[in-house]
């Protein structure tokens, strides 16, 4: 009997997505606004600081004030992703990959939203009646890489305290406006070496959940490996409150799964697309924490 002729081939009946950031992690940390029918949009009209005038005489003339105003602008970026599943390929696999491809494309679009938020956090923003004024990220809102140390260091408690001080000094309402600090795995590991973070002697309740620092000094920590570095290759970590940044959504993540009748084999196309943009709303609500790695 020729037993080898009975050998069988067994193929995987499941599909596994490889390691990746699964969608957006920052979308919920900023303001969100739906936008329609515009190549650029104004998420909010702003009124600046005014001060009361003390009266020193009776019946003085009323002098109108000149209240400062501003108008931030937000511009859209278009993103998409697609792939095809050939009908002849589906005949040769146990598991149809269509839904897994749709999930992978949705994850990619979520990461694109995070990249847009991070990019526009530090980028020049447009303000004014028609967006003709350019406002750069202010140096006064940057925490130096060597802050509180004799040399260049990573993320430290001292830097987090300084970020909080800058926000409080600008009258940011940290009691009602959620504060976020974005870190990579390296900055998170820096904090695990800080005794003030990990010791219960300094904290009324644990700040770690299953080995992850989730909140410290009033900041919710969000992890992503999408953070950029500056020209000196130091990591740029945003520390901000929710009202300081807006994600404008012209078209939220949309998935279309349809048959391509213009291609041989009538393959299934998985198409994911979206249009969105982001901008800072107020520089005093944003801080850049520069960290060595």
Question: Whereabouts are the PLM-identified features?
Answer:
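Generic alpha-helical secondary structure signal
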Residues: 9, 13, 95-99, 158-161, ...
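Long, contiguous amphipathic alpha-helices that act as assembly "spine/axial" helices in icosahedral shell
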Residues: 44, 68-133, 171-185, 221, ...
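Flexible domain-boundary/linker segments
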Residues: 61, 118-122, 287
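Extended, solvent-exposed, turn-rich assembly/linker loops in the middle of proteins
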Residues: 130-205
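Sequence/fold signature of self-assembling virion shell proteins
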Residues: 2-29, 33-53, 60, 67-75, ...
